[in-house]
Amino acid sequence: MARTPGPAPLCPGGGKAQLSSAFPPAAGLLLPAPTPPPLLLLLIPLLLFSRLCGALAGSIIVEPHVTAVWGKNVSLKCLIEVNETITQISWEKIHGKSTQTVAVHHPQYGFSVQGDYQGRVLFKNYSLNDATITLHNIGFSDSGKYICKAVTFPLGNAQSSTTVTVLVEPTVSLIKGPDSLIDGGNETVAAVCVAATGKPVAQIDWEGDLGEMESSTTSFPNETATIVSQYKLFPTRFARGRRITCVVKHPALEKDIRYSFILDIQYAPEVSVTGYDGNWFVGRKGVNLKCNADANPPPFKSVWSRLDGQWPDGLLASDNTLHFVHPLTVNYSGVYVCKVSNSLGQRSDQKVIYISDPPTTTTLQPTVQWHSSPADVQDIATEHKKLPFPLSTLATLKDDTIGTIIASVVGGALFLVLVSILAGVFCYRRRRTFRGDYFAKNYIPPSDMQKESQIDVLHQDELDSYPDSVKKENKNPVNNLIRKDYLEEPEKTQWNNVENLTRFERPMDYYEDLKMGMKFVSDERYNESEDGLVSHVDGSVISRREWYV
């Protein structure tokens, strides 16, 4: 029985590899089963077969992943580098488990585009080694897996695949918030940035650092999504004219999209009156007041008035300026008010105007050579002298002089009253200081080189008892002349007797034989009458001489 070889095996690309038997059997002969070849002889053909198929498959160069943008064009690259003869190249798209031919290039029959791709697919060139195509007007259905296939002879088919991802570029818009931004109002949406129907969803950021953002996203069945971002802030007039920027990022964009928005903050008028320099005097000309107003929306008009309701002649209001047509007089002194209003309210400002007297100026007469004559001398003698000052200035000087005199008199009187009060207080305090108790002072004897002073010495029985403080100091006195019976007596009832005050005097040498110590001047030294005594506030009577000791 003869054996026939089976079909040749196919390469993964469809090429067939021919295998032949090493010992073909002779016709009509029955031979024993051949001996299995060594393992190495079996591996060599298999290695050559897999090498040929792998070399053919790896020779088609494509991009594994391609990103396409909806509505735009995309190129699908396919380069074929083989040494075999290329008989045909084609592109196919995989739909589930089946494939759909997109385009075919045959060297003899030319180009062919199938189905919905007609008019949208073009080959880049006519070379069989470059199967790159351009797909126009990308739609959602164009996403998926595409195969670039090449048919060669004698090895058969070779192919590589690329995956196309369709992105949708978002539609970006920036609009003003629904509500007006009012100075001092609550948190308000200033601007809204929208990135609509993007695939995938876009990313929105804000620049400005004046508020905060709040975003929300909505998804759709076609895998697109819309993101809405609101920029909120607390409006203030100082933010007027500031710029905030919406920044949109998306993989389908070549660069970020940036939209800016200028904040429009509305506020009531801010009013100020200018033009008065504080030196408006009688007779001055060409002065005016200006009403400056800053408001958004712009103010309707400016209204001038005076606080006292008067409106002197010569005042002309033109737009925001008040003109003083005539030379200034004291009648123009007053408080001028400017009121400005817009749709958000009314504001005003006022300025106090004071018209002072004209400045005093002395004009020097030009020096002209003068020749005297008898008639001129007579005219000079009879001419009345004129003061170079106006009468109003003289009246002012007179008033100032009278005021100065009155102020001086009042000040002098107040000064005298103050001095009198101080003197009385001083005398009263001095009188209150002396209590009427007189204590003899310790007598300090002179040195050997000095003669003893002749002081009056009081008698011992004429002095009151010591106070406690003095007794402590003189507990054991030396040569103390105070009599013992005096110290033992608690009281001297005769001390306040006027008759006992008249004593005889002893000479100073009466005590010369005694040692010097604590001595008292006796009233024997004095011969005084009632006129020589002084009555004290506590009822005691003291000698005038003792008063001055």
UniProtKB/Swiss-Prot annotation:
Glycan attachment points: 73, 83, 125, 186, 222, 331
BP GO annotations: cell adhesion; cell-cell adhesion; cochlea morphogenesis; establishment of protein localization to plasma membrane; fertilization; heterophilic cell-cell adhesion via plasma membrane cell adhesion molecules; homophilic cell adhesion via plasma membrane adhesion molecules; lens morphogenesis in camera-type eye
Residue ranges annotated as Cytoplasmic topological domain: 426-549
Transmembrane regions listed in the UniProt entry: 405-425
Key word Transmembrane helix present: yes
InterPro entries, per the entry: CD80_C2-set (IPR013162), Ig-like_dom (IPR007110), Ig-like_dom_sf (IPR036179), Ig-like_fold (IPR013783), Ig_sub (IPR003599), Ig_V-set (IPR013106), IgC1_2_Nectin-3-4-like (IPR033320), Nectin-3_IgV_dom (IPR033319)
Occurrences of domain Ig-like V-type (ranges): 58-165
Signal peptide: 1-57
Topological domain spans for side Extracellular: 58-404
GO molecular function, a single term: protein homodimerization activity
Intracellular or extracellular location(s): Cell membrane; Postsynaptic cell membrane; Cell junction, Adherens junction
Gene Ontology cellular component list: adherens junction; apical junction complex; axon; cell-cell contact zone; cell-cell junction; dendrite; hippocampal mossy fiber to CA3 synapse; plasma membrane
Primary localisation category: membrane
Disulphide connectivity of cysteines: 78-148, 193-246, 291-338
All residue ranges annotated as the Ig-like C2-type domain in the record: 170-258, 269-354
Recorded topology in the membrane: Single-pass membrane protein; Single-pass type I membrane protein
Deletion consequences: Mice show an ocular phenotype, microphthalmia, accompanied by a separation of the contact between the pigment and non-pigment cell layers of the ciliary epithelia. Male mice exhibits infertility, suggesting a role in spermatogenesis. In the hippocampus, the formation and the number of adherens junctions at the synapses is impaired, and the trajectory of mossy fiber is abnormal. In the auditory epithelium, impaired formation of the checkerboard-like cellular pattern of hair cells and supporting cells, due to aberrant attachment between hair cells.
Keyword annotations of the record: Cell adhesion, Cell junction, Cell membrane, Disulfide bond, Glycoprotein, Immunoglobulin domain, Membrane, Postsynaptic cell membrane, Repeat, Signal, Synapse, Transmembrane, Transmembrane helix
Tissue specificity field: Ubiquitous with high expression in testes. Localized in spermatids at Sertoli-spermatid junctions. Expressed in ovarian granulosa cells, but only faintly expressed after ovulation.
Keyword Membrane (UniProt): yes
Xref: PANTHER family: NECTIN-3, NECTIN-RELATED
Family that this chain belongs to: Belongs to the nectin family.
Stated role: Cell adhesion molecule that promotes cell-cell adhesion through heterophilic trans-interactions with nectins-like or other nectins, such as trans-interaction with NECTIN2 at Sertoli-spermatid junctions. Trans-interaction with PVR induces activation of CDC42 and RAC small G proteins through common signaling molecules such as SRC and RAP1. Induces endocytosis-mediated down-regulation of PVR from the cell surface, resulting in reduction of cell movement and proliferation. Involved in axon guidance by promoting contacts between the commissural axons and the floor plate cells.
Subunit note: Cis- and trans-homodimer. Can form trans-heterodimers with NECTIN1, NECTIN2, PVR, IGSF4B/Necl-1 and with IGSF4. Interaction between NECTIN1 and NECTIN3 on the pre- and postsynaptic sites, respectively, initiates the formation of puncta adherentia junctions between axons and dendrites. Interacts (via Cytoplasmic domain) with AFDN, providing a connection with the actin cytoskeleton. Binds with low affinity to TIGIT.
Protein's name according to its UniProt entry: Nectin-3
Species assigned in the record: Mus musculus
Gene this chain is encoded by: Nectin3
